[in-house]
């Protein structure tokens, strides 16, 4: 029996392989059947109503008895929101003055400096302070003095006398002769000038004929150019292209006469 079962499995596997290797041809009738089977399998599922704020939706057999979502439910917020710039409100028309707050340090200082008066019966009672640790009398005084109805009186400004600032005169770039400069100093009373190294009296007219204060161009002498010791001297040459220099012969003169008579004797 076991051998028969193994044979059946073997042949069944072979049949499956053969069916896979065969070419698959689908006829028109088979296509229609497949389409009909697909439409039957598809089951229309009703959409589940979404539960909204203010109402609960029931799905299943009790849909008719379930509560409906009210129409006045707020719409679902979108994912993106438009950015709106916040407009600053203008409070300038309210005419609000300076508002000051009382700190614990200020109230402690006021309690320390408080002196019992006749209204207090000469006694200082700490029960006058409220639960926050502030003195009611001091708080009332400060509120009266610092409320919005209290106009802030500006302090009197001390008139400051402006100090004159000495402005330095810009120095002119024009040339001023020494005589004119001394005359200006003498006219302003700063002191007298000097004439030839000697002090001249104040407010004295300068000497126009003095060449030291009023130099002239005719008095100027051109300085002669000094020649250097090792500087070579140059000769002035005119018509150098026409001038031809003849070299003199330096050879010794030849004596033509016979200074010895020995030659004559030998000849005879």
Curated annotation (Swiss-Prot):
InterPro entries per record: CDV3
Compositionally biased spans, kind Polar residues: 98-107
Regions of compositional bias (Acidic residues) in chain numbering: 76-85, 123-132
GO CC terms in record: cytoplasm
Ranges of Low complexity composition bias in the record: 51-61
Basic and acidic residues compositional bias, start-end: 40-50, 221-239
Chain intervals for the UniProt region annotation (Disordered): 40-145, 184-268
Family: Belongs to the CDV3 family.
Protein name, per record: Protein CDV3 homolog
